[in-house]
UniProtKB/Swiss-Prot annotation:
Top-tier EC class: ligase
Region CPSase, residue ranges: 1-205, 1-207
The protein's assembly and partners: Composed of two chains; the small (or glutamine) chain promotes the hydrolysis of glutamine to ammonia, which is used by the large (or ammonia) chain to synthesize carbamoyl phosphate. Tetramer of heterodimers (alpha,beta)4.
Keywords carried by this UniProt record: Amino-acid biosynthesis, Arginine biosynthesis, ATP-binding, Glutamine amidotransferase, Ligase, Nucleotide-binding, Pyrimidine biosynthesis
Listed name of the protein: Carbamoyl phosphate synthase small chain
Encoding gene per record: carA
Catalytic activity as recorded in UniProt: hydrogencarbonate + L-glutamine + 2 ATP + H2O = carbamoyl phosphate + L-glutamate + 2 ADP + phosphate + 2 H(+)
Length: 398
């Protein structure tokens, strides 16, 4: 049985100008913002209180509609510096956003555009006036939901046709989205993290050369590696091992990204396996972690609801410490499938799902969470130093 859920917001609208229609036929009404049109995607919820610009521009959110549980939105505006997409003009992040409140006019010295106009520019459809926490409960009960988000300023909707559209989209399983968001050519990177009253600076040192395989990489990951004195060469997701080794890297990074890891594995896994055999230090994050797991013979699974937010407790078995981390993934490594020569290094304390691994006897490790944050806490920044410690050991013995 399907239902129509009207907007609960106190401000009144003569008729809804935006809808969220789930694959089961449920219709959620509200006020439209941002771009107009129709977009399909998997609906997930994000519990972060800040960083909406970074979240919406994370390429890992390709083909996803984000339900923000924090009620306020837009109060710091947007700027041209906090975008996480490597190629910001290509709009590789989320396709839709769902908000509790109407978008607030910005009050921040770094803002150069309000969120509503920014959403239009980036072709992101938004739905305001939704009981986002009730929608979150629905996702927690039923699991990840597929659907479509529609914005028409005139409020003209063919509900029957739109429900059929929502039912047709099959979801993220078996989708290789890394090929849609990856760089198309080699790119050199030297920008370091933002510093108060100074902005972003460039790295003049060249202590290490890192090749970063771009499955949908975030800018802040690159900045943190540059802060360690690394010269970084970003390469497309399908770059073969011969081209990578020809660049004489001191380490290789496997980036985050969207989609089903088993689909991306078709071309990524052979390269990763060859890199493991080369004994070059390897570090993977998010999708890179999942691809590394597949490369050693483990399995990945689709999660019930995924982990998306900046307040996730993760335990590091090596340091025996608990850190609060940012997460953004709907697939996970199946712990029981890890082979004997691979050690689990991190777990989520929410559901005990795998959050890290290392290959015993090899300078190779990865994590499911996002140590670069952006947005989120910096508890896991030490993982970048762990990577560079492996690189220094490798350079001494090479």
């Amino acid at each position: 049985m399907t239902q129509t859920i009207p907007s609960p917001n106190p401000w009144s609208i003569s008729r809804p100008t935006a809808l969220l229609i789930l694959a089961d036929g449920t219709v959620i009404e509200g006020k439209g913002a941002g771009a107009t049109g129709v977009a399909e995607g998997e609906i997930c919820f994000n519990t972060a209180m800040t960083g909406y610009e970074e979240i919406l521009t994370d390429p890992s959110y390709k083909k996803q509609i984000i339900n923000f549980t924090f009620p306020h939105i837009g109060n710091v505006g947007t700027n041209s510096e906090d975008i996480e997409d490597l190629t910001p003009l290509n709009c590789h992040g989320a396709v839709g956003a769902i908000f509790k409140a109407d978008i607030t006019y910005p009050s921040n010295y770094r803002a150069n555009e309000n969120l509503n106009q920014w959403l239009k520019t980036r072709k992101i459809i938004a739905l305001c006036g939704v009981d986002t926490r009730a929608l979150t409960v629905l996702i927690r009960e039923k699991g990840s939901l597929n659907g479509i988000i529609i914005h028409d300023p005139n409020g003209n909707f063919d509900i029957h046709a739109l429900k059929k559209h929502a039912q047709k989209w099959t979801g993220l399983i078996n989708l290789d989205l890394a090929k849609e968001v990856t760089s198309k050519q080699f790119v050199e990177w030297n920008e370091k993290p933002w510093v108060w009253n100074k902005g972003y600076s460039t790295n003049d040192a060249c202590n290490f050369h890192i090749v970063a395989i771009d499955y949908g990489i975030k800018r802040n990951i690159l900045r943190l590696m540059a802060a360690h004195g690394a010269r970084i060469t970003i390469v497309p997701a399908n770059t073969n091992v011969e081209k990578i080794l020809a660049m004489n890297p001191d380490g290789v990074f496997l980036s985050n990204g969207p989609g089903d890891p088993t689909a991306t594995a078709n071309y990524a896994v052979p390269t990763i396996q060859a890199l493991i055999d080369s004994n070059i230090p390897l570090f993977g994050i998010c999708l890179g972690h999942q691809l590394l797991a597949l490369a050693v013979g483990a399995k990945t699974i689709k999660m019930h609801q995924g982990h998306h937010g900046a307040n996730h407790p993760v335990k590091d078995f090596i340091t025996r410490k608990v850190e609060i981390a940012s997460m953004n993934h709907g697939f996970a490594v199946e712990t029981t499938s890890l082979p004997e020569h691979v050690e689990e290094t991190h777990i989520s304390l929410f559901d005990n799902s795998n959050c890290g691994l290392r290959i015993i006897g090899k300078p190779v490790f990865s994590v499911q969470h996002h140590p670069e944050a952006s947005p989120g806490p910096q508890d896991s920044h030490y993982l970048f130093q762990r990577f560079f410690n492996l690189i220094m050991d490798y350079k001494r013995t090479a």
